[in-house]
């Protein structure tokens, strides 16, 4: 089997797409289309994977499956992931470093743990809301 076909078969198996390889794209669910998009992005083993809201259109179970798969893939391959997302639970789970943006400007950055400690919050959603509301750490009630 040629290298490209082996890689397609490998990714199809990993992303649970084997039974869908001959199905037209119009017959795929949102979750299946997301997994196909991941396979297409990973076919050449990139060192950096760019993802924009990768689970936004997915049901909770499928979104969780995709996040788990991405965690495993990153750990096994060493591929860096640049993630754009409004889903702070996803960001907290998948990211080592976070840039918080407001109107296209970086207003804070750090590891999820560092941002949580800096803002005295329990989850990044609260940090995100504080930043969106323009509240600095000093303005947040204890």
Predicted segments, located by residue:
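Conserved catalytic motifs of ABC-family nucleotide-binding domains
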Residues: 45
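Catalytic Walker B motif of ABC-type/P-loop ATPase nucleotide-binding domains
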Residues: 49-52
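Helical segment within the ABC ATPase nucleotide-binding domain
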Residues: 64-76
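Conserved ABC ATPase "signature" region
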Residues: 2-20
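ABC ATPase "signature
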Residues: 109-110
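Conserved ABC ATPase signature
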Residues: 24-28
